[in-house]
Amino acid sequence: MKTSQLFYKTSKNANKEAAVLSYELLEKAGYIFKTAKGIYTYTPLFWRVALKMMDIVREELNAIGGQELVLPILHPAELWQKTGRWEAFRSEGLLYTLTDREDKELCLAPTHEEVVSMFVSQWLSGRKQLPIHLYQIATKFRDEIRPRFGLMRAREFLMEDSYTFSDSPEQMNEQYAKLRQAYQNIFDRLEIKYVIVEADGGKIGKGKSEEFHVLCSLGEDTICVSGAYGANIEAAVSQPPQYTYDKEHLPIEEVATPDVRTMEHLQDFFSLPSHKIIKTLVVKLSYGEKDKFVAISIRGDRQINLTKIRSKLNADECILASDEELQQHLGTEKGFIGPLNCPIELYADETTRCMTNFICAGNTKDKHYKNVNWDRDIPRPEYGDFLLAEAGDLCPANGNAPYEVFEGVEVAHIFNLGTRYTECFEVGFQNEQEEQQTCWMGTYGIGIGRTLAACIEQLADDRGIVWPKAIAPFDIAILYNGGDAASQEAAEKIYKDLQNYGYAPLLDDRNERLGFKLKDSDLIGIPYKLILGKTFQNSGVLEIESRSREKFFVEPKDFFNWCKNYFPKPRGFSPIS
């Protein structure tokens, strides 16, 4: 394509509202246009990149037996009510809902488990059809509260979602392994740094779940890695540092602690390290329309993990109780909540099990207690893993080697759902004993826009976007000084030859100076620039510069051999001989 034909626009100035680099560069380089908050027009330049990304996804999914379909975007409320997710999603305010002319409620799809389950339940005729792997690449919707992150957190976004249906847990696991490998192949082809980590299933399901994270400084998520094992910090199981505690139980003491509320204040007041103090927080657990308040005690040097609490106690939601709720249920305020004399159900982290003679609050303002012990002073609560992993914690899954902590962006998520949705929609078959058997389901998704934005976050430099070669909008930009007739003639010939060989060149035929064109090419992120400047004018040698600033000087007769080595294989053409 020629620049004069391409409908695009670059900008010198960054959008002041852009909260992340990828949003700033996508707008600046002419890839997206903001229609409204969190809603974007994908420009022709963006769509070239997206189509290449989607081609890679389709190739890898088709290779393992995936069948593409298109599911509806409008979903009847009754389908979501069947699984209990209608109210769960609406309570978060993330679901777009509407009412039709017959006064029936619908939603704009954020995900498609209900719709695909209903479809398969009507078409599945027998066990011989299993396993089934269906996928789509479609627009989805979430009413994000603060959509300031461009494609990272848009209200309307492009996503690939796969659904598998199997005759047994074993077959479901086989499908999971196939999809996991296919997703690995997709991200390997992008040549970006990513990790696969254990994750919490959230509202989707509670079976085996993993996330794919692109490593970048944006740090929307924190991930813990030890050797080949990784986990989202919300799901990471870790062994924190261990301490020795007194064997002899000392007499309990009540101590006046006026306005001593924080861990730092307690350490100073008692002249003790935080690991000898127990802190307690109250959380509100939601079960459908019912709420329950429980207290969670944890060692003073650690942070609480709301995701683990929600999972352990099988709640739909878990949040910290508000100041008003603390007064209502405990009659006290932050800083003075404790396991001693606790009027609500109490749980404690495993790290507190061996603690003796510890400091804690007793749910009375301006008072703490010293030399408190389990059993003698407080009945032992139910223990669990409620802590947030930290760098340096030991990883049980990797022989107790320490964790390293990285920042990343989640770009894909894979789940084993079991029979949660298939039971609701009676997706099943008759087994050999002619008994009705429920199918086992998996769900998988790649955020197309998020992946493209994450590539920018990881690879961009001070000159602009750096696309992976596999998805760049063009293979090479052909640049020359506007008004230089000889260079223009050579550029036109190279441009046509590249097209004939199946490559995707961009010929910048604008009547602009070379420096201007170079800056635009770098901003857009084209992997290579063929520069017809002074070197070409003086010696006839082609100057090529990669986006990573590596330079090549190539004789025109050798240029297409160079292309064969440095470009992706031409699409739809035989390799260059």
UniProtKB/Swiss-Prot annotation:
Keywords: Aminoacyl-tRNA synthetase, ATP-binding, Cytoplasm, Ligase, Nucleotide-binding, Protein biosynthesis. GO terms for biological process: prolyl-tRNA aminoacylation. It catalyses: tRNA(Pro) + L-proline + ATP = L-prolyl-tRNA(Pro) + AMP + diphosphate. It is found in: Cytoplasm. PANTHER family: MITOCHONDRIAL RIBOSOME PROTEIN L39/PROLYL-TRNA LIGASE FAMILY MEMBER, PROLINE--TRNA LIGASE. Homodimer. This is Proline--tRNA ligase.
